[in-house]
């Protein structure tokens, strides 16, 4: 009986992991420029392309992103799984998207398991801009990117943000892979942090561990003072290719 139940749950988890949902949220930012009101962004994270997630997977994902017709696309790391793969081929589908304000990417922890040059070259070659301790200004909004390994220690993360030069009088969006040290993000004037990494725990009992580590920032939209944080489940899986109690997702964000 137990074995049959385990097999059924596993089968459900594998099927559920391939069904990518679209999560829709609205974020209100203080002093948002008029040009940004009503604009949308698609947030993608934790695709984990490699042996399990292949070219067919990324083509389906990119097609779903394209259907949303958002103004800008954010990819917050772990696009690749740090395994041997055709990096250029797996990045190529992104080049088929028409995104008015562009696509932006920050490195996650899995891309740091080996030389990240291959990933960065592939992503850049597909027309995606890599943000690494960098800031881009788009119609009065500051878009900031900090890679995972620059955000794991609070004081180093703080120094990185301070060096970027954030204008506290204008809204800012931080792309960084994990919802670590969100108090630092808030203290340095970030308006909205977008992250992934947690997978929502992916399945029991890891969901409990993730909630214990990250608390309210483990998944969804949360607030810490003036800082808002959205942590996504991500679009892929790590380890067993299954999800039970969580959904694979991409996020359509509307700004107001």
Task: Say what each PLM segment does.
Residues 18-31:
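Alpha-helical transmembrane signal-anchor/signal-peptide segments
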Residues 28-256:
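Soluble catalytic domains of enzymes that build or remodel membrane lipids, polysaccharides, and related
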